[in-house]
């Protein structure tokens, strides 16, 4: 799942200490779903989004539960935009080319 998002201006007005506390809650929730691997890419200045997060899992139900629980955390107050979410299938470059009929 590919999940681009943008933080609010209010997020950046918080102290580093406060932001770290909010992120600690985020990390705690994420650790409850060990089947979901998280990869964060910062893209500020490259695209319309500030971050793109890639979640890797063979359990879509776990991903959906994780996202729902994260939306109930303090950190969600500071998310300005978090859509669209893209569902993807991991495959080799060779298999990707074959799937395109090339």
Report each predicted region and the residues it spans:
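Alpha-helix capping and helix-coil boundary motifs
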Residues: 15, 59, 91-93
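A generic secondary-structure signal
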Residues: 28-29, 69, 73
